[in-house]
Amino acid sequence: MKIVQPIRDMDVLMRCYDIARAHDKRRKPGEVSWELLMVVGLNTSLRVSDLTRFRVRELRGQDYAQIQAQKTGKEARILINPAARRDINRLLAGRKGDEYAFQSRVKDAATHKPKPITRQRAYQIMNMIARRAGIQERIGCHTLRKTFG
């Protein structure tokens, strides 16, 4: 695994948010919200394998995000600050509670239900945001954990 860097400059971080918001304004139904990925990733500092497993009901209207970490098996209970909670509620409005918050268009072959996005897709999204923001450093999903963590 290669080492990735946090986003240290607040202006660059805000540019990334602006890019994610602009993308979301013109995204097609069923596409992943780039802004939601940034908001949840930055505010929970969870690994991408844990982020992608969140269901809408586990985030929307909640003061805490609770999850069993996939890598360590430990229970994690993370406070969601009021600003992040407002953004999460806005971004998940109108979505069904049992949907994945970061839902893929790919369906499970056995159940025919949508699956969460892969960590590779989350990485692609983060890199598209970073490149559009002019970030030259190596960026990845772990960047979200490192930025405020």
Task: List each model region and its residues.
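A Lys/Arg-rich helix-loop hairpin that forms a DNA/phosphate-binding surface
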Residues: M1-R8, R55, R138-C141
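C-terminal catalytic core of Y-nucleophile DNA break-rejoin enzymes
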Residues: V4-Q5, Q70-N89, Y100-N127
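Basic, Lys/Arg- and aromatic-enriched nucleic-acid-binding interface segment
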Residues: I7-T44
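Short, basic (Lys/Arg/His-rich) helix/loop patches that form interaction surfaces
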Residues: I19-E31, G97, Y123-G149
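Non-catalytic DNA-binding core/recognition domains of DNA-processing enzymes
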Residues: G30-V40, V56, I80, A122, ...
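Conserved tyrosine-mediated DNA breakage-rejoining catalytic core shared by Y-recombinases
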Residues: T44, R53-R86
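Residue-level signal for well-ordered alpha-helical positions
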Residues: F54, L91-G94, R105
